[in-house]
Amino acid sequence: MPKLVTWMNNQRVGELTKLANGAHTFKYAPEWLASRYARPLSLSLPLQRGNITSDAVFNFFDNLLPDSPIVRDRIVKRYHAKSRQPFDLLSEIGRDSVGAVTLIPEDETVTCPIMAWEKLTEARLEEVLTAYKADIPLGMIREENDFRISVAGAQEKTALLRIGNDWCIPKGITPTTHIIKLPIGEIRQPNATLDLSQSVDNEYYCLLLAKELGLNVPDAEIIKAGRVRALAVKRFDRRWNTERTVLLRLPQEDMCQTFGLPSSVKYESDGGPGIAQIMAFLMGSSEALKDRYDFMKFQVFQWLIGATDGHAKNFSVFIQAGGSYRLTPFYDIISAFPVLGGTGIHISDLKLAMGLNASKGKKTAIDKXYPRHFXATAKVLKFPEVXMHEILXDFARMIPAALDNVKNSLPXDFPEXVVTAVETNVLRLHGRLSPEYXXK
């Protein structure tokens, strides 16, 4: 039976096996179980001897891959993978994935040193960023057969290595430092069309605003190559060693992986975890008080900016030695306000991915949510009332200046339509905070 050897920073963690019936099993290596660095690959796959055969194995590895069936088909076509199954796809592109996981076929030897790369010219960078238009997955252009990466999510993206001011393609098992996200474009739905052609600017703006309001988010910059604009987001699951000679991978996983769930149920409405489940899980964090506070603060922020995609795969935890864990920075933040006014899109259609508690059931409609719903949610979760009021009061006090500061920091060619759409609606919802909380 074929096996994929699983590594974390050059330490053998275990083996992923695909059985004849297509089932996936995982077994931790004895040397990993005995190591002082030992930690579970996933909190849904506790350290243990013997084969793990639960559905969590398939789901964990499947969640390392792009969500889009189209992108998965491109991977099959590009590398002649045997199927769309996680084992077969990761056999081809598992050298650099989310967190610290590196997957290498047991019969394959990686000859490149730990850190090796090829510097990209601007023309070459543009080729990588536009590869999806030629049906090439994740920027893995045909001339670079040693460039094998996996990036989860639904958006067109790739991952690259930044060395100084240069963008580089990593070689062998060299990690990447940045996720590069392309404009989403138009999304056609049965009754509506979402114009997300300015998603790069949208996400950049939202990240700046989040940082201005004290939320922990990654650094990002807009990059240009030829006629392409993209968002380069610094990976928080990567860190240089003290000498800056080796780039380390930091173990992490998203909440679908944590709960052993497939990505198909990442939304609460589809059966995925909501605020209550994640807040209960964060009680076990090594920084429980901070993580629970930050998570609730981020729920308010998502409401204020009209962020509708805060599902389980967009929240993650670092996995530390021994199996302790803590919340990662927040990521994949985009406002739906700039798409309002498009074909069939109204503010009444915008819904939070995770519902708030209300007098009757859950409140998800952004335009129908008020501070009282956050207070009610906090009460149900036994989150301190004083902490919830502090969060709301801080937003009431900080929002106007934060909006001004972000606007003043933007480049001259930044699309005004994005700023105006987000600002106008944030201030409108901010008005619901002010009477009750601005003076507190």
Swiss-Prot record:
Disulfide bonds: none annotated. It catalyses: L-seryl-[protein] + ATP = O-phospho-L-seryl-[protein] + ADP + H(+); L-threonyl-[protein] + ATP = O-phospho-L-threonyl-[protein] + ADP + H(+). CDD domains: HipA_Ec_like (cd17808). The gene is hipA. GO terms for cellular component: cytosol. Keywords: ATP-binding, Kinase, Nucleotide-binding, Phosphoprotein, Repressor, Serine/threonine-protein kinase, Toxin-antitoxin system, Transferase. InterPro entries: HipA-like_C, HipA_N1, HipA_Ser/Thr_kinase. It comes from Escherichia coli O6:H1 (strain CFT073 / ATCC 700928 / UPEC). It is an enzyme of class 2 (transferase). This is Serine/threonine-protein kinase toxin HipA.
